[in-house]
Amino acid sequence: LMGFGTTMNLLDGVDGLAGSLTLLSLFFLGGFLYGIIGHTDVARYLLLPHRPDGARWGILIFVAAGGLGGYVWHNAKPSAVLMGDAGSRFLGLLVGMAVLASGNPFMVLVVSPVVLLNGGTGLVKLLLLRFFGRLGFDVRPPARNIVNAQAHNAATEEEEARQAFFVRFLHRYRFPLHDHCRKKLNWSDPQVLVRFMLVQALLTPLLMGLLVKLR
């Protein structure tokens, strides 16, 4: 729960992004809890364990999604309402609790693939850089990526050229991923929002189908 809350917090850099992706996650989770594992006949047909409290959890999730929809309406760029760190972490907690209620922790990979890809890859990069740093590799970021390079002890172009290729590869990408899309690919905030939502809206049904039918 703490890890997913942190990952969700990393989404809070584009107006409406965290709320919109969470809204998609809640709709799919609510449908799964209420209409699949909360329904005796459907769960039996799909050979899934029936959870008697699944329907109650589904209703709770749909109610939370309705409230979140009102927030997203006012959080569209330019945002009139901000959630801050406390709000984004609460969204992560809400999705995490619903995933645990489903009885399958791996459901988080199904309902929030873009959320995990956006923030999780940044955590992986950080861990890898710390690991390589402990092994003695120069893992300083390149000076071209930092405004005040000396204050951040960044690597010059000559020092960057001497760094290991995997360190240079890691520094080539900015994280969270939405920041890379904005700074490196020159996507606007609305482009990031729509494209991230589209990817999650396409991936989640596909992964859900693999989970319930082809597992």
Feature locations, PLM:
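Alpha-helical transmembrane segments
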Residues: 2-4, 16-215
